[in-house]
Amino acid sequence: MAQQSLAFEIGTEEIPAFDLSNAVKQLKTLAPKLLDDAAIPHGETQIYSSPRRLIVVVEDIPEATEEKNEVFKGPSAKIAFDDEGNPTKAAQGFARGKGIDPSELVVEDGYVYARTHTPSVKVATLLSSVLDGIVRGISWPKSQRWGAESEYFSRPIRWFVALFGSEVIPFTFAGLTADRFTRGHRFLAPGPFSVDNADELVEVVRNAYVVPSEAEREEVIRAGVAEVEAKTGFKAELPAKTLVEVVNLAEYPTVLVGTFDKEFLQVPEEIIVDAMLMHQRYFPLYDEAGKLTNRFIVVGNGDPACSDTIIDGNERVVRARLYDAKFFYDEDLKRPLESYVDQLAEVVFQEKLGTMLDKTNRIKGLAQHLVEDAGLSQTDSQDALRAAQLCKADLVTSAVIEFTSVQGVMGSYYASACGETDQVAQAIEQHYRPRFAGDEVPETAVGKVVALADKLDTICGLFSVGQGPSGSSDPFALRRSAIGIVAMLTCENPLTISLVSAIDASLALYAQEGIEFDHDAVRKEVIEFFITRTRVMLRDAGKGIDAIDAVLAVDVQEPVELIHRVEALEAARKHEPETFENLATAYARANNLREPKLGSDVDENLLSEVEHALSCAVVQAENRVALALDADNYAEALQELAALRGPIDLFFERVMIMDEDQALRENRLKLLNRFVGVFVHVADFSLLSK
C-alpha cells in the first residue's frame, strides 16, 4: 500500500522561548500517541520549531488502514447465558466491550466468542481529529484567546498548513482553515509560500529565512560565537538558560559583536553582566585573564546586510541600561550600608511573619546561637553577627531594586566601600548559597552561619504558619533550602552544630515575636522534613535503602548523624564484607531468640564461664560503642559490634539457652536482650540485607 508523509504547521505570533521549548518536548510524545490512538500506522515523527511556528512531520503513513477480522474469546457459555438462553450481564459487558450486539455472540466449545470486522478506512478522513488533538493537547503555562473565537493557545494562531502527501487535510480551529500556504521570516521573507507536498514543508520554510529547529539554531549561534572568540581572543559566557531563550527568540540568528564605553567597567562586574544577560539577552565577553571587557555578543534576527544598524541599536540599548546601573550604584554608595537596614521595615517578608527587618533581627538572633554552638572565635563571631545585621540591607538599594539577581553581591560591594571587614563583605555576598543542588557553599564559617540562619529562619517560619511543602508544591523552595543547609553541615569544612538545637532556637525567636503555633508539632514537622530530605539525598547518592531505614529505625534526628551512620554501614558492606557479615550474623542469632519483656537485668551468679565471657564482652562493647558514638566515630562503633561475633557464636555452641530450669533460661534470654541492646543504639540490623 502506498505511503505518504503528514506535515502539520501551526503558525503563530511569537511564542515565549521556554514555552516553545517545552511544547516541542510535548509534541514528541503527543503526536505519535494520537496517531496510535486512532489506529493509524506511522513511521518516525519529527518536530520542528521557530518562535512563530510548530511543525509536526510524520513519515510512512499508509493511505488507508488495514481491514481486520478478529475473534475474541469470552466467558463460558454457562456464565454468558441464563437457563432460558438470555444473555447475562457478563455476556452483555463482553459484547459491549467488543462493539457488537449480544445477539451476534457465537458459542463454540462451551465458550462465547465475538467476531469483529474493522473495514479499511482512508487515513485522510481520520487525520482531522488527530490534528485537533495536537492543537488542543499542548499544555501551556499561560494561554489566551484572540478575536471573537473561544479557543485557547499560547499566542494567537495566524495560519495552518496541513498536508497528507499533496492533499490538504480538512481542518479548522479558532476560525482558521488549514491550507498549503506557509510563511517565512517576518521581515526577510514574509510569504505566503505554497507547499506542494508534505515532504517539502520544512525545506520551503528553510528557504524562507527560517532555521526550523532549536538544535540547528543553537548550532548556528555556537558556531558564530566560536568565530568571534577566535577573532578577538576573548571568551563568551553562555549560560544555558539564556542560550535556550536566545535560541528561541530568533528565526534566522546572526551573531554580532557590540561595544560599550569603558567607563562603565567601573561599575561592579556582576551588575553589568546582569544588565546584559538577564535584561537584554546579550552574552558578555571576557579577556584571557577572565576580566570582563567592554564588548558583548548580540544575536540578531534581521537582515545580515543590516548588521551595522542592528549593532548600533543594541549598543544604544545597553548604553542606557549601563548608564542606569552606574547611576544607581553611585547613588547607593553615598550612604553607608547600615543606613538601609531600617528601610527593610517597608518590605514584607511573609504576610504572617512580618517584614524583612523582622527577619533580619531573627537571623541575627539565630546567628548568635549558631556561633556559640559552633564554638567560633570572638572575631568570627563578631563578623557573623555583623554580616547577619547587614545581609538583607541591599534589598532596598536602587541597584538591587532594578537588578534583582545581584542581591547579596551588591551588599558585599557596599559593605567593603564603607569599611566592613573582608569576611563580613564575603559573608553578605555568599549567604544566599547554595542556590541550587551542586552549587558551592559559603567559603567561611562566618558565611555558613549567616546562610544557615537565613534559610532555617525561612523554613521554621513557614512551617509555623502552615506553609510547608505539600506533594509537588513547594512555592518557597523550602526543599532546596533544606538541601543547602545539609550541604553546609556535611561539606569539606562543615559548620559543626546541632541542627535540632538550631531549630529550637529559631522557633523560640518566632514565639518571642508573638507568632502563635504549636511548638512541639511544628518542631516535629521541621525535623521530619529535614530527615526526609536527607533520606532522599542519600538515596539519590546511591546509598542502600535498607541501610538508610536501619539507621532511621533508631530515631536519628540529626541529618549529619544519619548520613555518617549510613556511610559507615555502606563502607563496611562494600570494603569490609567480613565485618558486615559478623555484624549481621551476630545480631540475627541473638535477635531471633531474645524476649524483650524479660528485660536485661542479668544475674551474674547464674552465669557459666562461657556466659560470663559473653557478658563481659557485652559490657565492654557497651562502653566502647557509647564512646565511639559520642565521638561520632560510627565506623569504630561497627567494629566493636562486629567483635561480638566470636563470643556470641561460642555462647550458642556451648550453652543450652532454653534450659528446663526457668531461672537459667530467663537469665540467658536477658543476656541476649542486653546483647541486642548494644546494637540498637547504632541501627536496626534486622532491616539490613546482605
Show the residue positions of the predicted features.
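Amphipathic alpha-helical "coupling" segments that flank catalytic cores
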Residues: 1-690
